[in-house]
């Protein structure tokens, strides 16, 4: 190779050889492509071809059937590219077109749209970069002059079938311009896919060239040559779709979660001891055992524990086990979890970028290639900074809430860390001198420290950022625009910030008059602070209005708006006025000892209790005395441009930022250009304002002018501007205004907080409060539950509380790009999302997700027992939103890296995707599992199959009959028919149908159905043409049966919608479906008129699958029908009957347990010593009644997902006299909590009836039995429900019983879930019934087999006919398989 390229890596690829005798080891070869075949060609012309050539793609796809054809695709740049538009189905011409069955037209009214069948991705080729053959990639890169290669044959092996394969060593060379910034000119993604296979093990390469034994042989053959992946790389470590890989189960997400670190339940022992410094016999702390020391340390608060932990290693280890002010001892797995979470919060580790591959050339030069984008870096290895926080994913019921509270208590009093490079402003708030905040502008954003702040800037907010480029010529002093003066640290060091509104070439300097000290609240003496009314009226308040305000504003018995009683004139002269930074109201400070020089000041700092809230009205000054100082003005004779005035003007402009339009800009420029002689007119006759046209625009700048301190008056239709009255020797500070107009207006302030923000579902607020009240020392934590009606200032939210609890709905409501929420203006110590997986439940951009991501916090935590919903084909995609909330730098901030680096490789079962995911989750997720803990009693599950009661069975069959009739008459169960429920286009209607069928297993219902008289007449006329006599009883019987139903002629079972055959037999759907070619009545055998697929194609079914009985289908009438409606009032449910019987038995057992308990107590009463008070004994026994008795009582949890089913259960439990509580939507929260308290404390209340709204957060560890009234498809939800009882604190085994109706869709689902092998085949794409699905995302597991459920629906028979129906159904299924 020429000197302009370097050897950067190598790989070995495997190819087929037609004539191995002509090929020798060491032979050179070159890559080629003749348009149809890509491979290598040796020097003697021998072709080495791919073992699965791409040219066979079309035949490979075609062999899988029409339903597998997505797009043939094209190979470009070494990748398989898929066209954007689907290939349209070709509609063949049919000479025998027939009308759409009338029974179909009632379903979707004859849709004419062509069907598009679901297609399965062809994994043998692969859509993920890296799974396509490296030979294709090499050819594309060589053709595009991205690299050069040298190839030689190093090994040839022969298989059992006589096939010969060769191993080709490929050396890859890159140009030396790489170290001068060279990048791949084309096909970067292809290059990235190729470089994942390259190796820089130069010792291995030497061994390969020397012919040393590096080949692992099995049965005399080289195993890696014959166990080949799609990439054709010898011994590929990435497992690119290896055939029949035994590691397929490793790509199940629940298997990934199981492999994550679990704290376990082992106690941590410490060997450190305190030793005396001498051999003295004096006793000391070294004589105390660890248990004694721990009991002492548990009495200390957080601050004292921090102090004593610094003494020695023993105390450091002992304090790590203690949670201050917690009223219980943590379990070992909780202690380990708290330790892990503290370690994650202490510091963010810096590590190498997971997507950059490291390479070394043969002569030692290093470079790095991005495995997704193909970007090359030759300098230092790229590094990424880990986030602080993570995902706390203990299984439900293991005490995540207590663990989270322990973390909060361990770090109580710790303030959030501000971003680097910004000064902190310290201030006092309610006697707390350690309050702080910081400010920044848009030009101070950095990629790391302020990335969180960028997120809540919407495009609309960016448009509101004002630029005053036009004012640059006005800067006579060439002053450097600076940040607001109050932004500084305690040492008076200020931030030197640039102004994003100016170009860098302007040279400016800081004027001497600006010392950049903190803004001074000066003694204003006789200054009246209500000089700037917000309305356009008189220059001062009239005495009448003043009196009115005095009469209306009263607080704590003190009248506001006038001089305070008891003040002397000397007090007035020493008066100090302070402006609140939150509400901008002015407060008068009388205490002369108060420091007036500082940063932020708030109403809460006021010594006067009548004015310590921002909600209190502003005080008024009622003396008309000369004003010697006023912000925005300077003393005559001075140069102006005072720092206080610059800050004042800047704050006013920022406050009115939304009002600054082009017209307002012109007015401000006019004001800033006024000379002194013009300003002097404001003292006397008034200065006419700028003429800007529209009155609406004038209102904007007039508000700003008044905020500056100027007064307006209309004289003869002309608005004139004046100085305030009683102004003495002061001039408007125009130079300061010029500087202020050049300040950036997009300033944000964040208040540093010691608080933790906890966001929970609405139904878990009371759970958190209960846990805090029960397990945390009283008054230890300052708690705020932020409800919808509460309005708080940001600084109060940040500094007044240790824990702020709010809901996801509140979080969503707070998102407003045009207005900053108080939540966004706080820099939280920690943000926790309980049940945080709900952020990833939607792929769309929701308000709550945007708000959660926009929150600024040092530490971010997700608490959930179910990180992803149970959606096997798309569940991994739900993790990326969680990573974005956590601000994970690689995969959370860059969706492209997530998709190409983890999601697509993982779904393609490539090892690199699994390893990256595992590496990511092992770093930021922890999960304890119940099976690893020994303190929890077992959970015993069983499924109980029940039979219908006769009335309920008839209701169920009526709905099933309607569904099956639709499917059968749509070209005889053909899923290609666009009006069939099995068709992929009908997925929404199919889901509704399945939900109704599920509900009908629990609740009786009805379909209001009327015949279409015209259609039935057509049917009867057709029968008359087939020799039916109009005046016979047979004619009347058939007509009446089609209208009202009849018994099946073959099996005798009642059918509401019978099928009439051309031979005039009335059959049920089961009997007619036994044979599609002839009548199934014994002795009849009438042959139907069959129509073949070749003549059957039409818009309703462009791709027929099989022949159908044309005359039978067209003979059937259609029926007008309404939706299926549940009727719970009249339901006789066998499920509830079974439940009542079980509850009665448990209730009898409870009575015996309580009687036995009371008898034992009475025996103990006789053993009490003489003289014991009977009243005391009675009180003691009564106290035990609610506690000790509960240990012996069976409590039952009843769960249903359907409100109608809950009503049936509620009705029949009440009738049976069983006392129960209820928690279900839409009950009010108060009633739910009342019912829960009754269930917990009343021994006679043995059952709690609830729906999914109570499946989260409840601690029902005293419950012994759980009844699931219907199968729960989402297994994560089922686990949540069971975990209400099966959790820490449970003392007895938990019995879980799932009630399932026999022979229904419920039984189908239970059988499917119990068959793990079938589930695996379905999820891998091999299950035949799932082939018709489209590419839409599957929401739950049962979505994958919806069509299978409907196609196997069967009627429910009663009593003796069950066996007959079972045999009929078996025969029907065998016929369909045949």
Curated annotation (Swiss-Prot):
Keyword Nucleotide-binding in record: yes
Biased composition (Basic and acidic residues): 65-96
Basic residues bias locations: 97-107
Disulphide-bonded residues: none
Motif (DEAH box): 834-837
Residue numbers binding Zn(2+): 580, 583, 603, 614
Residue span, F-box domain: 282-328
Alphabetical list of InterPro entries matching this protein: F-box-like_dom_sf, F-box_dom, Helicase_ATP-bd, Helicase_C-like, P-loop_NTPase, SNF2-like_sf, SNF2/RAD54-like_C, SNF2_N
Disordered as annotated region, ranges: 65-113
Domain annotation Helicase ATP-binding: ranges: 720-885
GO CC terms of this entry: plasmodesma
Record's keyword terms, sorted: ATP-binding, Helicase, Hydrolase, Metal-binding, Nucleotide-binding, Zinc, Zinc-finger
Example of a GO MF term: helicase activity
Domain named Helicase C-terminal: residues: 1185-1324
Zinc finger motifs (CW-type), residue ranges: 571-622
Binding site for ATP: 733-740
Membership in a protein family: Belongs to the helicase family.
UniProt-recorded name of the protein: F-box protein At3g54460
Lineage: Eukaryota, Viridiplantae, Streptophyta, Embryophyta, Tracheophyta
């Amino acid at each position: 190779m020429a000197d302009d390229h370097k050897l950067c890596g190598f790989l070995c690829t495997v190819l087929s050889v037609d004539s191995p005798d002509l090929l020798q080891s060491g032979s050179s070869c070159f890559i080629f492509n003749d348009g149809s075949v890509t491979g290598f060609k040796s020097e003697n012309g021998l072709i080495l071809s791919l073992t699965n050539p791409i040219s066979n793609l079309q035949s490979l796809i075609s062999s899988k059937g029409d339903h597998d054809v997505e797009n043939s695709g094209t190979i470009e740049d070494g990748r398989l590219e898929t066209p954007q538009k689907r290939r349209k189905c070709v509609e063949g011409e049919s000479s025998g077109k027939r009308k759409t069955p009338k029974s179909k037209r009632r379903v979707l009214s004859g849709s004419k749209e062509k069907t598009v069948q679901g297609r399965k991705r062809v994994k043998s080729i692969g859509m993920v970069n890296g799974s396509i053959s490296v030979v294709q990639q090499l050819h594309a890169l060589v053709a595009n002059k991205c690299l050069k290669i040298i190839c030689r044959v190093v090994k040839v092996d022969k298989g059992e079938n006589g096939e010969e394969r060769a191993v080709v060593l490929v050396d890859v060379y890159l140009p030396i311009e790489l170290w001068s910034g060279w990048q791949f000119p084309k096909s970067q993604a292809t290059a990235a896919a190729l470089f994942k296979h390259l190796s820089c093990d130069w010792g291995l390469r030497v061994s390969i060239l020397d012919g040393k034994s590096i080949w692992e042989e099995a049965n005399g053959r080289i195993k890696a040559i014959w166990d080949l992946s799609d990439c054709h790389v010898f011994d590929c470590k990435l497992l690119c779709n290896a055939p029949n890989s035994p590691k397929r189960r490793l790509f199940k997400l629940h298997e990934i979660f199981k492999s994550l670190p679990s704290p376990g339940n082992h106690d941590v022992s410490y060997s450190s001891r305190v030793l005396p410094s001498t051999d003295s016999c004096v006793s000391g702390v070294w004589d105390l055992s660890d248990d004694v020391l721990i009991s002492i340390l548990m009495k200390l608060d957080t601050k004292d524990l921090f102090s004593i932990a610094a003494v020695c290693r023993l105390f450091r280890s002992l304090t790590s086990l203690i949670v201050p002010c917690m009223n219980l001892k943590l379990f070992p797995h909780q202690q380990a979890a708290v330790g892990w979470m503290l370690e994650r919060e202490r510091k963010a580790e810096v590590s190498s970028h997971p997507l950059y591959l490291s390479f070394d050339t043969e002569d030692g030069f290093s470079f790095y290639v991005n495995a997704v984008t193909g970007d090359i870096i030759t300098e230092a290895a790229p590094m990424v900074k880990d986030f602080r926080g993570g995902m706390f994913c203990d299984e439900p019921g293991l005490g995540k809430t207590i663990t989270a509270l322990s973390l909060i208590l361990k770090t109580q009093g710790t303030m959030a860390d501000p971003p680097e490079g910004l000064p902190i402003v310290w201030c006092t708030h309610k006697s707390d001198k350690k309050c702080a905040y910081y400010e920044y502008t848009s030009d101070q954003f950095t990629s790391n420290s302020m990335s969180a702040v960028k997120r809540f800037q919407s495009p609309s907010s960016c448009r509101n950022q004002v630029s005053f480029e036009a004012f640059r010529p006005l800067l006579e002093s060439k002053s450097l625009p600076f940040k607001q003066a109050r932004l500084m640290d305690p040492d008076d060091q200020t931030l030197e910030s640039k102004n994003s509104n100016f170009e860098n070439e302007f040279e400016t300097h800081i004027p001497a008059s600006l010392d950049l000290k903190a803004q001074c609240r000066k003694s204003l003496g006789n200054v009246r602070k209500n000089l700037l009314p917000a309305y356009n009226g008189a220059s001062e308040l009239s005495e009448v209005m003043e009196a009115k305000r005095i009469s209306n504003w009263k607080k704590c018995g003190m009248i506001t708006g006038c001089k305070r009683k008891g003040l002397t004139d000397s007090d007035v002269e020493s008066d100090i006025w302070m402006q609140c930074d939150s509400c901008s109201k002015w407060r008068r400070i009388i205490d002369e000892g108060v420091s007036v020089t500082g940063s932020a000041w708030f109403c809460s700092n006021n010594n006067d209790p009548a004015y310590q809230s921002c909600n209190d009205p502003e005080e008024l000054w009622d003396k008309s005395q000369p004003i010697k100082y006023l912000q925005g003005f300077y003393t005559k004779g001075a140069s102006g441009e005072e720092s206080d005035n610059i800050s004042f003007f800047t704050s006013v402009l920022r406050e009115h930022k939304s009002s600054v339009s082009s017209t307002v800009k012109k007015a401000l420029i006019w004001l800033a250009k006024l000379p002194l002689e013009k300003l002097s007119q404001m003292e006397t006759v008034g200065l006419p304002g700028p003429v800007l046209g529209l009155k609406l625009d004038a209102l904007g700048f007039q508000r700003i002018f008044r905020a500056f301190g100027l007064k307006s008056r209309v004289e003869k239709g002309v608005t004139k501007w004046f100085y305030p009255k009683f102004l003495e020797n002061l001039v408007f500070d125009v130079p300061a205004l010029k500087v202020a107009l050049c300040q950036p207006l997009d300033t944000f302030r964040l208040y540093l907080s010691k608080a933790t923000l906890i966001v929970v579902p609405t139904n878990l607020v009371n759970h958190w409060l209960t846990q805090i009240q029960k397990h945390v020392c009283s008054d230890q934590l300052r708690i705020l539950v932020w409800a919808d009606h509460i309005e708080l200032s940001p600084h109060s939210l940040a500094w007044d509380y240790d824990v702020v609890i709010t809901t996801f709905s509140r979080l969503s409501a707070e998102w407003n790009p045009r207005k900053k929420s108080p939540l966004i203006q706080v820099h939280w110590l920690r943000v926790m999302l309980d049940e945080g997986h709900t952020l990833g439940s939607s792929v769309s951009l929701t308000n709550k997700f945007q708000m959660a991501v926009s929150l600024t916090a040092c530490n971010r935590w997700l608490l959930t027992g179910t990180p992803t919903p149970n959606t096997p084909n798309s569940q991994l995609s739900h993790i990326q939103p969680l990573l974005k909330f956590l601000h994970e730098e690689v995969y959370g901030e860059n969706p492209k890296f997530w998709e190409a680096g983890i999601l697509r490789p993982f779904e393609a079962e490539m090892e690199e995707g699994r390893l990256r995911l595992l590496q990511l989750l092992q770093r930021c997720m922890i999960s304890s599992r119940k099976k690893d803990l020994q303190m929890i009693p077992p959970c015993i599950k069983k499924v109980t199959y029940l039979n219908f009661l006769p009335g309920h069975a008839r209701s169920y069959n009526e709905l099933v009959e309607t569904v099956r009739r639709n499917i059968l008459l749509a070209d005889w169960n053909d899923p290609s028919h666009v009006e069939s429920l099995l068709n992929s286009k009908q997925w929404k209607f199919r889901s509704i149908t399945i939900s109704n069928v599920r509900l009908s297993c629990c609740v009786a219902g009805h379909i209001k159905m009327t015949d279409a008289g015209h259609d039935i007449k057509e049917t009867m006329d057709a029968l008359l043409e087939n020799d039916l006599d109009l005046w016979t009883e047979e004619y009347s019987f058939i007509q009446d049966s089609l209208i009202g139903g009849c018994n099946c002629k073959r099996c005798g079972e009642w059918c509401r919608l019978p099928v009439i055959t051309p031979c005039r037999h009335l059959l049920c759907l089961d009997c007619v479906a036994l044979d599609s070619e002839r009548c199934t009545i014994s002795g009849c055998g009438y042959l139907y008129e069959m129509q073949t697929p070749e003549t059957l194609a039409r818009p309703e079914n462009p791709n027929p699958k099989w022949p159908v009985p044309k005359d039978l289908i067209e003979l059937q009438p259609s029926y007008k029908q309404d939706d299926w409606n549940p009727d719970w009032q009249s339901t006789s449910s066998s499920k509830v009957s079974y439940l009542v019987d079980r509850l009665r038995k448990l209730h009898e057992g409870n009575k015996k347990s309580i009687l036995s308990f009371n008898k034992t107590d009475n025996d103990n009463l006789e053993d009490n010593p003489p003289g014991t008070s009977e009243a005391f004994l009675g009180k003691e026994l009564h106290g035990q009644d609610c506690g000790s008795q509960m240990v012996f009582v069976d409590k039952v949890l009843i769960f249903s997902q359907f409100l109608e089913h809950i009503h049936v259960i509620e009705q029949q439990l009440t009738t049976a006299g069983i006392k129960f509580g209820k928690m279900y939507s839409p009950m009010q929260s108060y009633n739910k909590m009342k019912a829960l308290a009754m269930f917990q404390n009343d021994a006679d209340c043995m059952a709690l009836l609830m729906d999914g709204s109570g499946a989260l957060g409840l601690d029902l560890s005293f419950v012994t039995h759980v009844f699931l009234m219907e199968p729960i498809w989402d297994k994560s939800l089922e686990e949540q429900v069971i975990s209400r009882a099966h959790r820490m604190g449970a003392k007895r085994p938990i019995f879980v019983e799932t009630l399932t109706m026999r022979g229904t869709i419920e039984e189908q689902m239970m059988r499917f879930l119990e068959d793990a092998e079938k589930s695996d085949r379905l999820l891998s794409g091999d299950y035949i019934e799932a082939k018709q699905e489209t590419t839409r995302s599957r929401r739950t597991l049962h979505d994958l087999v919806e069509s299978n459920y409907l196609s196997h629906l069967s009627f429910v028979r009663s009593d003796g006919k069950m066996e007959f129906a079972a045999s009929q159904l078996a025969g029907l299924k065998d016929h369909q398989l045949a």
